[in-house]
A protein has these predicted regions:
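Extracellular/periplasmic, surface-exposed regions of secreted and cell-surface proteins
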Residues: 167, 172, 205, 212, ...
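Extracytoplasmic gating/loop element in the C-terminal half of outer-membrane beta-barrel translocons
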Residues: 315-317, 327, 498, 570, ...
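Low-complexity intrinsically disordered tracts that form flexible linkers/tails across taxa
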Residues: 400-416, 772, 790-796
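Acidic, proline/serine/threonine- and glycine-rich low-complexity intrinsically disordered segments
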Residues: 826-828
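Short, small/polar-rich motifs associated with maturation and membrane association
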Residues: 2-49, 53-376, 381-396, 459, ...
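Acidic, glycine-rich flexible loop segments
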Residues: 305-322, 336-338, 407-443, 448-450
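Conserved small/polar residues in nucleotide/adenosyl-binding loops
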Residues: 830-837
Length: 837
């Protein structure tokens, strides 16, 4: 006969093989009727009886009634009550009561927006009373600020955060793209090309020079591109926006600070996490192009109207058919795939996190590809009661590939021209330019010219923490940031009319950047008389960077597939450069809280930078901000109030911008060749005069803000208004020719002024919570930019297209404003003939 045995854990004196296996299995066994052993029968009967009892208990359904209240005893209306991991559930009525039929040994999960979810075992009971506790996760959230962390409820400045749950499922390639639209006051511009970095602007463009924010990864300021990071390794991103938050970074805080924190291990058994992501990309709003017949007909009309000869091959344009759509030939569906595996865990005294990742992305333009490999290793070790070590290591290597291409050329290329000739060679216009234009075959250049950039990035730090007492610690951090990238371009020779490339060429460049950082600071955190909470951070920071660059180009290679530099017959160019900069700083921050109602944050930083002359090498950058948590006042209504947290903030601070290059204060020269007698001699030509008096661009910012949490943190609103003024903006001033220098000679001077003012709003709501959850977020930003002074009434024209400039810098206008003639309307040929003179 066949018997189904419920097999749990059995053991006796001679059989212990399953002792360590608590898993429950079902086994199908065949028992011969000849087995008449009394011991066996007794055991079999016991097993069957146990199975019967277990199945009976499992199948027993009971009707359970319950009452759900909050901490004050008020009923919670509409709370979700669900049996375990099933879809069997209900909601509480207007009195907080519910009734549900469940197995006697099941568990119930009770949840409601604004309260912590509770799991309650039934244990055969017929009635339950459940008290839900308010969920203060939003207020207790810890945000990363410069050289430390703070609870969100203690913040006095403008700080926005993006957590791992906001970015983990984003179908994008890097963390910068994942932040788009999630932080108010932050504009993120995606370059669109795989592997290229996004451009981040915080609260508008604050200068005509470099307005990019400072990037800090695991406490280390770096210029590492966000495209080099593995999104799966990022725990959170905190954006410091106003001066009271960024002044701790002094001369580098004017444009805001982006703090990126990577994931860490936690106490518990080792956990393996696998992430896989696949997405496709397509160009949007692709313009409709003329086909061959339409283009030929339109060209014939144009030539006839201009009294020019038309192309005899276009006598009947309809015979040309559709021809070539060069945009369709150039564009494709891009595919992105990324994979990562991490292993994390730890004990009470040591935690670890290790991960590896791979990203492969093909761009929407043919032959454009990007690949990246990542490795992350973080650890924490509590050596003893007073000593702790923390390490972070981020490594990535990537390859960007792609030929030379131009979307504009693809739009201008002729649809009457095929991509390739009948013999398989690349086609190209070969007749008169008036008929065929002057654009090379844009698909041929895409495949024949090769561009490759390989990068290697290594970012690491180790922090030692000495605890003198529970409230006084010393932290020392050493950071190392190394970047290597190698560019390799090859262009073969080809005879494409009307612009042939007569010489093949290969260009290579090697770039190396090394940055060393050493931070030392004390951290004090203590509460006095249970009312006065004081936090102090004070210390120093030293940072040094070295950059080395070497490039060379050789022309005329005999074979296109053998183009090592040694094989080039002609040395076209060779060059290189080296630069250094250093920054030495002293900084301090004071946080004070009285009964969690009145909050104060004051910071000061003094920076000394090698980028400025000895007359103005040092600068001081202070800030102060205040906050009032009105909801903590005794008179503020607590019971049945829709507002559970309300805070007002005000802050003012001074920050700087030193991103002007390394040697702006010294004189610079270019080489030139001049005839002296019968010979040409090399000479130095002055291009920039020295100015040892230039100093940091200075940004003064005032911020007003309000934070509000409603309906048990179901709705969270933040509003900020700001005025940001940039003074002593570094601009280039022309030198009068009466000085003896050429009229192209310039010098840096602190003269420009700019202003940004605006408002920001962030609204986050928790709409549903339980078996199905739904959260939403809305961000809105308004910013107005205006140049107040440029040290000249003459506008500075920038951003050239063809032979014309399209934007300018001018006092009274926004930065990079487009300009042109204002017309009254189109002018017709008839109108011109009527006004002939």
């Amino acid at each position: 006969m066949w018997i189904l045995l419920f097999h749990g854990h059995f053991s006796n004196d001679t059989e212990n093989e399953n002792k360590s296996n608590p898993n429950i299995n079902f086994k199908l066994m065949y028992m011969k009727q000849s087995m008449k052993s009394k011991g066996f029968e007794r055991r079999l009967l016991l097993i069957m009886w146990g199975l019967f009892l277990s199945l009976s208990a499992f199948a027993q359904q009971i009707s359970i009634k319950g009452h759900v209240v909050d901490a004050t005893g008020e009923p919670v209306i509409g709370a979700s009550v669900v049996e375990g991991r099933t879809t069997n559930g209900t909601i509480t009525d207007v009195d907080g009561n519910f009734s549900l039929s469940v197995p006697a040994n099941s568990t119930l999960t009770i949840s409601f927006v604004g309260y912590k979810t509770q799991t309650v075992p039934v244990n055969g009971k017929n009635s339950l009373k459940v008290t839900l506790q308010e969920d203060t996760e939003v207020l207790d959230e810890v945000v990363v600020v410069g050289y430390g962390t703070m609870k969100k409820s203690d913040l006095t400045g403008a700080v926005s955060s993006v957590g791992v749950k906001d970015i983990k499922d984003s179908p994008v390639a890097n963390i910068g793209q994942a932040m788009q639209g999630k932080v108010s006051g932050v504009q993120i511009i995606d370059a669109g090309k795989p592997g290229d970095n996004v451009t981040i602007k915080i609260r508008g463009l604050g200068t005509i020079n470099n307005s990019n924010p400072l990037i800090v990864i695991d406490g280390i300021p770096t210029d590492l591109g966000l495209s080099s990071l593995n999104m799966a390794d990022v725990e959170r991103v905190d954006v410091l926006k106003d001066a009271s938050a960024t002044a701790i970074y002094g001369s580098r805080g004017a444009n805001g600070v982006v703090m990126i924190t990577s994931k860490r291990g936690a106490e518990g058994a080792g956990k393996v996490t696998v992430n896989a992501n696949w997405a496709i990309q397509n160009a949007t709003k692709v313009p409709d192009m003329l086909n061959a017949a339409q283009y030929a007909a339109l060209s014939n009309d144009m030539l006839s109207n201009n009294d020019d000869n038309t192309n005899p091959y276009w006598a009947d344009p309809s015979l040309l058919g559709t021809g070539t759509n060069w945009l369709d030939e150039m564009l494709r569906t891009g595919v992105k795939q990324s994979y990562s595996v991490s292993y994390s865990g730890g004990t009470e005294k040591a935690h670890y996190y290790v991960s590896g990742g791979f990203l492969d992305q093909s761009g929407i333009v043919e032959s454009v590809n990007y690949r990246r490999f990542n490795f992350q290793a973080n650890s924490d070790a509590q050596v003893n009661k007073w000593l702790k070590f923390t390490t972070n290591l981020t490594f990535s290597t990537d390859v960007k590939e792609g030929g030379s291409y131009s979307i504009g050329d693809a739009m201008k290329a002729l649809p009457i021209q095929p991509v390739k000739n009948e013999d398989g060679s690349w086609s190209g216009p070969g007749q008169e330019a008036q008929w065929y234009g002057s654009v090379r075959n844009p698909i041929g250049t895409l495949y024949m010219m090769t561009n490759e950039t390989k990068g290697y990035n290594f970012l690491a730090n180790i922090t030692g923490e000495i605890a003198f007492t529970k409230w006084l610690k010393l932290k020392s951090t050493f950071g190392y940031d190394a970047k290597f990238w190698f560019v390799d371009n090859f262009t073969p020779a080809y005879d494409w009319k009307p612009n042939p490339v007569e010489e093949s060429s290969r260009y290579k460049s090697d770039n190396k950047s090394f940055t060393y950082l050493w931070d030392n600071y004390f951290v004090f955190d203590h509460t006095f008389a249970q009312k006065h909470r004081v936090g102090v951070m004070a210390g120093s920071s030293a940072q040094w960077n070295n950059y080395d660059y070497l490039n060379a180009q050789k022309n005329i290679f005999m074979f296109d597939n053998i183009h090592e530099m040694d094989n080039g017959e002609k040395m076209y160019s060779i060059g290189g450069s080296q630069s250094d900069w250093a920054l030495l700083s002293l900084m301090a921050r004071l946080n004070y809280s009285y009964e969690d109602k009145y909050l104060l944050t004051a910071t000061v930083r003094r920076d000394g930078s090698s980028r400025f002359g000895k007359n103005n090498r040092w600068g001081t950058f202070p800030s102060v901000s205040l906050a009032w948590r009105i909801s903590q006042e005794e008179w503020f209504p607590k019971d049945n109030s829709p507002v559970n947290d309300l805070k007002l903030r005000i802050g003012y601070g001074v920050t700087g911008n030193q991103e002007i290059g390394n040697y702006g204060f010294v004189a610079s020269y270019n080489t030139g060749v001049y005839p002296f007698g019968n010979n040409n001699s090399t000479a130095l030509v002055s291009t920039t005069l020295s100015n040892p008096n230039i100093h940091w661009e200075e940004v003064r910012q005032t911020n007003f803000g309000v934070d509000m949490s409603l309906f048990n943190s179901r709705v969270n609103l933040s509003l900020d208004a700001y005025i940001k003024k940039t003074a002593d903006m570094l601009v280039k001033a022309s030198i009068p020719i009466t000085s003896g220098f050429e009229d192209t000679t310039e010098t840096f001077t602190n003269a420009g002024k700019m202003r940004n003012k605006g408002v920001e709003m962030t609204l986050r709501t928790i709409n549903l919570k339980g078996l199905f959850s739904w959260e939403s977020a809305l961000t809105a930003t308004y910013n107005k930019n205006e140049i107040l002074d440029l040290n000249s009434e003459t506008p500075m024209f920038i951003n050239q297209m063809g032979n014309s400039y399209v934007t300018m810098l001018r006092a009274g206008y926004p930065i990079n404003v487009f300009y042109g003639y204002v017309t009254d309307g189109p002018v017709s040929y008839t109108h011109l003939r009527a006004h002939e003179t």
